[in-house]
Amino acid sequence: MALHLHRAERTDLLADGLGALLADPQPDPFAQELVLVAARGVERWLSQRLSLVLGCGPGRADGVCAGIAFRNPQSLIAEITGTLDDDPWSPEALAWPLLAVIDASLDEPWCRTLASHLGHFATTDAEAELRRGRRYSVARRLAGLFASYARQRPGLLAAWLDGDLGELPGDLAWQPPLWRALVTTVGADPPHVRHDKTIARLRDGPADLPARLSLFGHTRLACTDVQLLDALAVHHDLHLWLPHPSDELWRALAGFQGADGLLPRRQDTSRRAAQHPLLETLGRDVRELQRALPAARATDEFLGATTKPDTLLGWLQADIAGNAPRPAGRSLSDADRSVQVHACHGPARQIDVLREVLLGLLEDDPTLQPRDIVVMCPDIDTYAPLIVAGFGLGEVAGDCHPAHRLRVRLADRALTQTNPLLSVAAELLTIAETRATASQLLNLAQAAPVRAKFGFADDDLDTITTWVRESNIRWGFDPTHRRRYGLDTVVHNTWRLGLDRILTGVAMSEDSQAWLDTALPLDDVGSNRVELAGRLAEFVERLHHVVGGLSGARPLVAWLDALATGIDLLTACNDGWQRAQVQREFADVLARAGSRAAPLLRLPDVRALLDAQLAGRPTRANFRTGTLTVCTMVPMRSVPHRVVCLVGLDDGVFPRLSHPDGDDVLAREPMTGERDIRSEDRQLLLDAIGAATQTLVITYTGADERTGQPRPPAVPLAELLDALDQTTSAPVRERILVTHPLQPFDRKNVTPGALLGAKPFTFDPAALAAAQAAAGKRCPPTAFISGRLPAPPAADVTLADLLDFFKDPVKGFFRALDYTLPWDVDTVEDSIPVQVDALAEWTVGERMLRDMLRGLHPDDAAHSEWRRGTLPPGRLGVRRAKEIRNRARDLAAAALAHRDGHGQAHDVDVDLGDGRRLSGTVTPVFGGRTVSVTYSKLAPKHVLPAWIGLVTLAAQEPGREWSALCIGRSKTRNHIARRLFVPPPDPVAVLRELVLLYDAGRREPLPLPLKTSCAWAQARRDGQDPYPPARECWQTNRFRPGDDDAPAHVRAWGPRAPFEVLLGKPRAGEEVAGEETRLGALAARLWLPLLAAEGSV
C-alpha cells in the first residue's frame, strides 16, 4: 500500500481520473469506496460527475453514483483517532473544562493577566460584571487557540507539558500553566499524545477502513493531517487528488518536497520559484502544501494539461500553468469578453450589473444554461436580499426585467437569516443585554412569527408606532429595569409608563387632566383600538417576563430553557420545521457541552455561544440543482463552470480582515503550512480563476454610492488586473474594466457599444423607458405651472377655508389641488431627552399655555408635561419646566386680563356682492374683542387670522365696537408682545379684497410669503426701501431658515429660489399705486389695511 499523488490544473480532470480509478472494482463487491472532499458543494458536483462514468448500464453514463461514501477529512481523522462521537479536545467541548480551570485559577500568580482581563481584580461592581461576562467567549477563544496549536504545531504543547517554554514571549507565559491545568482536568490523552499513538497504530496495522481511499480537492492540510495520511498510506492505498494550477511550478519546487513544514514563514523562499505574478501573490497555500507532503510516494502524476481557449482568460490560465507570462503575439480582440471586471456604485448596483451581464451571456450563447453559472461572494448575507430582489420573481413580477425568470439557489446563509424563530431568539438576547429601546421592540413586533402570535397587521404596527412616539417611550421596561444603568429613579420614557398612558387613554382623554398614578391619558386611543392596545400590552408584558428570565448567572441548560420559553411565549408559526430546527440547535449546543455544562454563565457568554452556533455554515442541498447557484467563496471555488462570477470583491471586504490574536503564539512567528485566512482567500481567487472555462466575471465597488468618490479594488483584484496587463502585448486593463454609471437608467446602459460589446448593456424595459425619457428634449427649468389654472366658480366662501388659506397662501394653492407636500417624518426616538430644542420648547410651551387658559394651575400644567415625558429627567427637566411654565404663565395672565368671562361664538354671514357670501363662526369673542395668544414669538402668521376674524365681525355688525388683540413673546427675551387692531373703515371692501386674493391663490402660487410680504409692506408704510428687509426674510442663512425654505415655496419655485422670483410685474387687476412688482402689489393689498388699523394697547 502507498501514497498516490494525482495533480491537475482543474478538478474535472481529477474527477475523471478518480472515476477511472473507481471503475476498477475492489475484490469485495460490497465494499464501499471512501472519498474525502473539502466542501459540500464539491461533494454534490463530484457525485454528479462520477454518475456519468460509474453507472451500471452500457456506457456507464446512466447517472447512478452508488457505493461511494463522501466524507470530510475531519470526520475521518475523528474516526481513526477514536473521537468520532466525542472529542474532548474539540474547541466546542474543550471550552467548558477550560472555563472551569480558569475559574479555579484566578488567584494563581501565573493567571494574574487573565484574571485582570476577566474582572477578578475590578474595583467596581459594574466593571467586574462587565468583565465577567467575557468568561465563556474568552474560554472558547482560548480553546480554539489550543486546538490550533494541537493541529498545526503539536510539539509546542508537548514542550509545555515537559516544562520547556522555548522562546515564548513573556506576556504569554500564562498559557503553559493553563494548558497543564487543563490537561489534568480533562483526564484524557492530550492531542499530541493521542496523535502519536494513532500514527503508531496506523503504521503497525491497517485501520477499519476501505483498502482504497481518496482525498479530493484540497489545497491546504495541517502538518498533523499530513502525518496521519502518511501513516494511513502504510497499509492502505491513499490517493491524493490535488488541484494545482501549474505543473511547471510544481517541478520548480521539487527541491522543497518533503522538507520540514515548520520552517518560519519569513524564511520561506519558495515564492522565488513562482515566475507568474499570480502564482507568487495568490498561490502561497499550494506552495506550502507541496512542502508539507511526504516525499515518499508510489505515484506522482500530472493528469495532463487542459486545452485552453484562445481568449484572454485562456491565455491567463495558460500563463499560470506555464508559470510565466508570455505576451508575445497576443492581441486582445474587441469581441473577447472572457474576462470582465465591473466597477459599480455599491452592492445594489453590482447585482444590477451582474444580472445584465448574465443575460447577455445567455443571449449570446444558446448552449449556456443557468446550471453552468456559479456566483460566489465573500459576504453572502449582505448580497442575499439583493439577489432575491433581482432574480427569481417571474411568477409575481409580470412583464419586467427578464432576469426575474432566472431561478436562484442561495447556500451558506446564517441560520438567523433562514429561520425566523432563530432570528427572534437572537433578537431576544440582544434586547436582554441592551436597553429594550423603542426601536428594538418595534422591530421585534414586526417579525413574522411575533405578528402571527399577536395578530399585528400592517395598520396595527403603524398605529403602535404612533402610540410609542406620542407617549414618549424611549427605553427600559420600568425603573427597575433601568437600575443597572443607575436610572432607577427615572420613571419617564419607560414602556411601563407609556403603556399606562395608552391604556388609560382608552377610558379618558388627556383634556380631563385626570391621571392614574404618574400616567397622563394619551389622546387618540379610539374605542375601536381597545383590543390592539391590549395586545400591545400583552406583547410588552410577555417580553418583559422573558427578558427578566434572561439575566443573572445560571447553567447553560437553564439559559436554553428560558430562551425556548421566550420563543414559545412570543411567536407562532405554521411551519413545524422552524420550531424543530430551534430544538435541534439547542440540543446540539447541550450535546457539545456534555456533562461539563455546569459552570454558571452570564448573558454575554450565552450570546457568544449562540452567535457561533447560528452563524453561516455550508449546506449540501442548495448546490447544483439546475438553477443559478449563489454561495460563498469556499464550497465551489475549484468546481469548473463555464461562467464563474465573483461578486463583492471590495477593498476591505476581500480578503477577509484578519487582526492577529494577541494571545496566539503561532501568530508571533508563523510557520509554513499554518492557516492564514487572508492567504486562504487569495488561494480561493486563484482557484476560481482556474475553474472558469469560458468567462470570468468580477464586480466590485468602484465608487461610493452616495458621494461618488472613487474606491480602489481589493488588492488581489488589482494584482489580477496587473497580471492581465502582462498577458498580452499591450495593456488590457482599460478594455476589460468597465466603469458603470450610478443609475441603471443612465443612457450609457441603453446605448449600443457604450459599455460592453456592440449591443445595449441593459435588458430592463423600465430602464430603457426611463433613459428615453431622460434623453428627450430638455427644456429649461420652469415654474411649477406654466400659467394660471381656470378660475374657480364664484361660490360662497367659508371663514374656515379663508383662514386656512392665509396661514400659507402657497400651501393653500396645493391644498386646493389635493397635492401632498413633502413633510418631515416623525421618527421614534430611543434616547431620553436631555435638552429641549426650540421646536420641543414651543410644543411644550404651547400645550402649557392652552392648559392654563382652560383654568389649569401653572404648576399642574407643568406636572402634566412631567407626566408626558417630554422634558429631561431630574433637576434639568425641573429647571426647564419652570422656565417654560413661567413664560407660559405670563402669556396666559396677559391674555386672561383681556378675557372677561367665557368666550362667545359669533356666527357670521356677510354679503360680499355679486351673489357671494362669507359665512362661518368667529370664536372665542370676549365682549367686543377677540384675544389670541401664542407661545411663539409674535409673527405675521399669528396676527393675520386675528385680523380676518375682526374684519368679519365688523362686516357682520358694523355698528358695534370691535377690536382684536394678539399676544405672544417678543423678540426680546422674556418680554410680552401685544398688538391691537381696530376695524377698517370699510370691512366689507377688505373682505372682498381678501376673497379676491383667495380666488387668485387657488389658480396659481401667489408670490405672497407671509414674512417676506409683511416686511415689504411695513417698509413701505414707514417710507423705507422695502427690498432689504423683504430679501432678508426670504433668503435662508446659516442662522435661521427663510421663506425660501418652506416646502410649498420649494415646490413652487425650486430649492433656494432667488428673491427675484417674487418680483414679476403685477397681473391685470392687481395693480397698486406705487408698486411695480407683483410682491409689492399683493403685499399692499393684504397688509396695508391691517397695518393702518393697528392701534396702541
From Swiss-Prot:
A single GO molecular function term of this UniProt record: DNA helicase activity
A cellular-component GO term for this protein: exodeoxyribonuclease V complex
Keywords assigned: ATP-binding, DNA damage, DNA repair, DNA-binding, Exonuclease, Helicase, Hydrolase, Nuclease, Nucleotide-binding
InterPro entries referenced in this protein's UniProt entry, alphabetically: DExx_box_DNA_helicase_dom_sf, P-loop_NTPase, RecC, RecC_C, Restrct_endonuc-II-like
Domain of life: Bacteria
A Pfam match: RecC_C
SUPFAM superfamilies: P-loop containing nucleoside triphosphate hydrolases, Restriction endonuclease-like
GO aspect biological process, one term: double-strand break repair via homologous recombination
PANTHER family reported for this sequence: RECBCD ENZYME SUBUNIT RECC
Protein's job: A helicase/nuclease that prepares dsDNA breaks (DSB) for recombinational DNA repair. Binds to DSBs and unwinds DNA via a highly rapid and processive ATP-dependent bidirectional helicase activity. Holoenzyme degrades any linearized DNA that is unable to undergo homologous recombination. In the holoenzyme this subunit recognizes the wild-type Chi sequence, and when added to isolated RecB increases its ATP-dependent helicase processivity. Unlike the case in E.coli, suppresses RecA-dependent homologous recombination, is instead required for single-strand annealing pathway repair of DSB.
NCBIfam families named in the record: recC (TIGR01450)
Assembly mode: Heterotrimer of RecB, RecC and RecD. All subunits contribute to DNA-binding.
Extra information: In the RecBCD complex, RecB has a slow 3'-5' helicase, an exonuclease activity and loads RecA onto ssDNA, RecD has a fast 5'-3' helicase activity, while RecC stimulates the ATPase and processivity of the RecB helicase and contributes to recognition of the Chi site.
Homology family: Belongs to the RecC family.
Protein name, per record: RecBCD enzyme subunit RecC
Organism: Mycobacterium tuberculosis (strain CDC 1551 / Oshkosh)
Gene assigned in the entry: recC
